[in-house]
């Protein structure tokens, strides 16, 4: 037996080598990294659970590989029989093993990408695999603008100084990996990078290998499943951990790199420390759209917590700065201030570790910074007390209340150093610190508030009924606008404490009261989701005034559904034609466009085109009224929700729509991919900055009139096809709920938000995230491609010359190319054979025809797409991505089969399986069985629910996107 097992174990390595594509280039170490992590993991698995379990994991991997080779559905059934024969404990161990192996494969990829990137930069080439098409190296961008496009260095510098990229972190419930595991993954990445370093001694190598084993084992021994849903405060703390760990240090490093890159085009100035190049905002604890757990109290807590964290980070750095600025020479202006502060402070401060005695006047910079430190200490402690007790005994006067007070003494130090010939010192840590203060302020991030438009109408309705003038909700749009404007132009208070309030109305008003009580710099925009008309914006302006918001938030309508996008330009034109409103906004307006719900409403093709046209029309309206419009892009992580490579996504926006200000959501699962490590944070900031600059200075081509006509025609056909299936087929919802794990999605405890807007109802009430998540799990990706095939077929059958036009559009028009490339990537990740297995096991016979028809549609769409792109094979232009996907396939297939059969057992109590004897090496009462006890409340047979959740997490890791 032992000999057989050894042979079997050797065979997985051979199998891996067979399945894995060859090296793509000389510096391709992906296979090496992946094999090392896999070997280490399998050794750990064997140590913990015995040879039999290891052999079982290898057998599943091999069977999965056989399916990948031939796409034979019988192989999936054979694999299913093996997986269903496992007892509950073994089943959890196997599902968990594959989920971990996928996470390790992802880590190997990340290390490989970073390794190739460093090599390219050393050689002076472009910094990513597909060359400049997917990457925006800032120095390359500067040189391209100057050398190829004839821009002067001064023009580039001027555009750069005045542009803003605002990254808005959202707590979308799509980060399916626990933070405890993310931290271990970061350490695994680190060990792997160092193991392959050049100057490593044998002893160091052994120690790193031991550390790698330790971290892989710690990750495997950590429960992957969140046992309780996170609260909004948890989500916010998780989001803030990225600021703490990478963004805080990443911003000054990135800005320093920009200074260096500017020298390459002959600009010897630095970017001004207060240039608004990068800004950060957040929705965590502010986004109450459909999330009853985000209460006014949560919003207050989140703001105070962020302020406390900011003060703490500044405080932790100020002593380093005091050590650095030990000079005695200074300007007269600074010396006078230092003497004044010195004479006012006589006491020693024993609560400080460094510089606790009174600082002598011959260290003037330290005297100034000592005062800054005192104020930061008080700011932090006051905020801590407000957060804990609601009141503080520290007077506000001894704290920093606005950013100018904080920057003023730092600017004084900077000016003084420059005036005495010490500019190199000024441009060191002091400049970095000033850039941090300028970027993060006292509030750390600006919190956006988001609320559904209907909730504001409910409040207005309560007010008009109380005043006895009728029902706001029953009025026409004209009546609403007339009343709102007359109130906005008047002075009288609208309501007092006697206004009858439902819980919902009270919640909305209390949110405005919290906004009025907290410092104004805590907040960014007030976003109205499901906005349709001008009154949606005006009613929020009125409520801000009524609740005494001293510095009203800018009000941002969010247009999401197809019809709302089409009506958006008219709504905006109506707003801009109101004198009161134009005076209020001071020449600036922001509009948010939603990718998720428009995609769910009409399909990806029509939604993408509608978003493109809506942006063009909105910009046109803004220009007519002389208003600078900022577009806020609500993109998800998945392609179905507007995701995709940053650089391409920005460069494919319509010309003129960015103009140096770009605001975009960075959602749930994408935050880790963008900011999880320092080098990822750097790359993210670089991509956004470079692509925004390039879009403004070299706008993409505008589509030709005949391309527009073709797109219009295709969008109509695609929407019709999409809606006829998703909304009009009476049995589609039943099919969707049977064929995917949508009903079970809520068990993952990913986020604090419910997955439905309303408890009952069909696809309309389902949130976009679970809708996409469910189809991603079965690898069918229906919302992404449905409609494309019908549209292509229609225009090609109408006139075969249209194929040539589509190919021309693909080659010349960035928007169209990005759309097609992203769909192609999704097809490369998809597998209709897997979706067919779900149908066979979970869907009743009378609904099979729906699935068969959709799979035929999938195949036809894929073939037409390849014709349009002029490709023989999927991803033929991106061998690296092709290699990475092939590496993951066998893991994902095992998890898919395990998921489909587990769903069958959960949903059909009469489904019979033959269990084999327990495999785990300890007795049947030991570890594997203990795993079952982690979930004591499950309503299903032991182990099934956890096995299911582990497969969901594993597949999400393998597809590299959740919802």
Swiss-Prot record:
Its EC number is 4.1.1.31. Signal peptide: none annotated. It catalyses: oxaloacetate + phosphate = phosphoenolpyruvate + hydrogencarbonate. Coiled coil: none annotated. Pfam families: PEPcase. One of its GO terms (biological process) is tricarboxylic acid cycle. The active site is at residues 172, 600. The modification Phosphoserine is found at residue 11. Belongs to the PEPCase type 1 family. This is Phosphoenolpyruvate carboxylase. The lineage of its organism: Eukaryota, Viridiplantae, Streptophyta, Embryophyta, Tracheophyta.
